A protein has these predicted regions:
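Conserved beta-strand -> loop -> alpha-helix junction used to position metal-binding or nucleic-acid-contacting
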Residues: 33-40, 45-81
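Acidic/histidine-rich catalytic cores and adjacent linkers
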Residues: 84, 88-205
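RNase H-like nuclease fold core
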Residues: 1-36, 40, 44, 48-52, ...
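Flexible interhelical turns and helix-capping residues at alpha-helix boundaries
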Residues: 24-27, 35, 71, 105, ...
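Hydrophobic/aromatic-lined pockets within catalytic cores
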Residues: 24, 28, 47-51, 67, ...
Length: 205
């Protein structure tokens, strides 16, 4: 479910706090896990508005930010190597794999510093079973939404007003929501797992 989309000219803890407070005022009582890229101020805002929320770095964005600075011929191999980090069975195994990859790829002038800097925000990820992790690092639904917005922008490069842009985004959002009909496999098992890690906070119908 999409709770909202926002058009802003800045990112800060104050800005994100206003968004999160709006969610709270609309009735969103709790957030179990916040998965996001390096949006400035978001982690601080979450800690202030929803202090019990577990914050995680978005694996998809970590991968993309790493591949962005790599030559095309090396991308496929590096993408495969990065799986050794986020599919590791334990945190210590992921760290060990990261150190090995750093040594391997430093010879090709590829930096994995982004992963080291975000390791604390990736750490909670490893306590979940592989099927639950896959839900977290697979961003198909979000990507389909972003692609829809990109097509909107490509078809009309200039919007006369902010309201015109908001209208276009709203219609695009409604169109993509209608296509979201499938459910996650073994959702009941995943909810049961979350209920163990977040007791009395998961509502299972």
């Amino acid at each position: 479910e999409i709770l909202g989309f926002y058009i802003g000219d800045s990112e800060s803890a104050k800005y994100w706090m206003s968004v999160l407070n709006e969610f709270k005022n609309r009735g969103l009582k709790d957030i179990l896990i916040m998965c996001a890229d390096g949006l400035k101020g978001l982690k601080e805002a979450i800690a202030a508005v929803y202090p019990k929320t577990e914050f995680q770095s978005c694996i998809v964005h970590l991968i993309r930010n790493t591949l962005k600075y790599v030559s095309y011929k090396d991308r496929k191999e590096l993408a495969q190597d990065l799986k050794l980090i986020y599919t590791a069975s334990r945190e210590d195994e992921a760290y060990s794999n990261l150190q090995e990859l750093k040594e391997k790829w430093s010879k090709r002038k590829v930096s994995l510093e982004n992963w080291e800097n975000n390791l604390d925000n990736v750490q909670p990820f490893f306590k979940y079973r592989p099927q639950t992790r896959k839900i977290m690092y697979t961003a198909n639904a979000i990507e389909s939404l972003n692609n829809c917005y990109k097509r909107l922008n490509k078809g009309r490069r200039v919007f006369p007003t902010v309201q015109a842009l908001e209208k276009g985004m709203y219609l695009s959002t409604q169109m993509i929501i209608e296509k979201w009909t499938s459910r996650y496999a073994n959702l009941g098992v995943t909810l049961a797992e979350l209920n163990i890690y977040f007791p009395d906070r998961v509502i299972i119908d």
